[in-house]
Structure formats: structure tokens, C-alpha cells
Amino acid sequence: MAFRDQPLGELALTIPRASALFRQYDMDYCCGGKQTLARAASRKALDVAVIEAELAKLAEQPLSRDWRAAPLAEIIDHIIVRYHDRHREQLPELILQATKVERVHADKPNVPKGLTKYLTMLHQELSSHMMKEEQILFPMIKQGMGAQAGGPISVMESEHDEAGELLEVIKHITHNVTPPPEACTTWKAMYNGINEMIDDLMEHISLENNVLFPRALGGK
């Protein structure tokens, strides 16, 4: 099967650094992970053949870890340590930086107005979301009750979509997280942090939407 006919989420999981490539092209492989590469490229007016060629080069590299075959409990523990704990560190720091940048550079035309507000909204939503996963959904899955967790999983997927929408707003008001020429050190550091946070959150959502949740529902 050609890469163009495969879902983005599957490609992101099976090809090393494919997720970074999709991020480069602003293709949603987490919440939009079920769409094929061809469909995603068409929506962005991108040349799918060029992306396929880049994926073919990446596919020659060994995959560090295939989470599709890992025990569900191990996936959950990885998600908490690698993503949940990291988001809890990232967002408060980014909010502090955004507050400073918006205040100090209020008169600059390229200042990301509203960034503090939307980062705060994302922090609040994710804090509630991760707590529900850790206290309700993840214990159910670890106890082998994933097949009965359709309701909670549906809610979590809906909240993933909401987080994805907030990321789009954040990218819009930061000009795709690109610092302007006049950006100070704090401004540049903040944008580096936002890019890292977006990468982490997209990988996090992809692992849940495309691996953990389907396998839990299927009792695998």
C-alpha cells in the first residue's frame, strides 16, 4: 500500500520522525489521525508525492519503540511520565512568559495579543482532562475494563478535539509560532517552548487516540 492511502496517525506511529514531518507541513496527525495522507495533503494544497518521498527516506530508519505492541499498562505509565507530567511543567512557565511579553511589548504590532488567555485556557482544560484520565479512565483500562469504557473514552476524545482547536488559535496569533525580527530573548524562548509543547501534545493525543483507546475498547 502506498503511503498516501494510509492514515496519518498510523504513519506517525510506524515511521520514525514522521510526526515531526507532519508538524512541519502543519498536518494534523493526532485529532485528524484517521484521514489518509492523500486527503490531508489535498486539504493543505500540498504535493503528496513530495511528502511520500520524504516518508520513504524516514522509513529506512529503525523505529525506537512500537507502542502498538506494548502492554496497555506500560503505555499508560509512559503517557503520565512523558506527557502529563511534562505538560504540568510547561504550561505554567509559558503563561508567565506570555504575560511578560504581552505587557512589555504591548506597543509592538507583532505582539501575540491574547496568548496568555489562550495558554491559560489550555492549561485549565488539560489539567482537568489529565486528572480525569488518571483517576477514572486509566485505572479502568489497567483493570481490564477498557471495553466498558466507551463513554469516558468518547469524552476524552472530544476534549482532545477542543485542545486541538486551542492549539490552532495559539498558532494563528503567533504567526505559526514564528518570532518576529524584533523579538527579545524571552519572546524567542517562549516560542521555542510553545513549539515543544505543541509537539508533545500532538504526540500525546496521537498515542491515546490511535493506540491506547482503540486497543482498550477492543480488549487488546
Swiss-Prot record:
The keyword Transcription does not apply. One of its GO terms (cellular component) is cytoplasm. InterPro entries: FeS-repair_YftE, Hemerythrin-like, RIC_family. GO terms for biological process: protein repair; response to nitrosative stress; response to oxidative stress. Belongs to the RIC family. YtfE subfamily. PANTHER family: IRON-SULFUR CLUSTER REPAIR PROTEIN YTFE. Its main location: cytoplasm. Di-iron-containing protein involved in the repair of iron-sulfur clusters damaged by oxidative and nitrosative stress conditions. GO terms for molecular function: metal ion binding. It comes from the Bacteria. HAMAP family: RIC_YtfE. Homodimer. This is Iron-sulfur cluster repair protein YtfE. It holds the Pfam family ScdA_N.
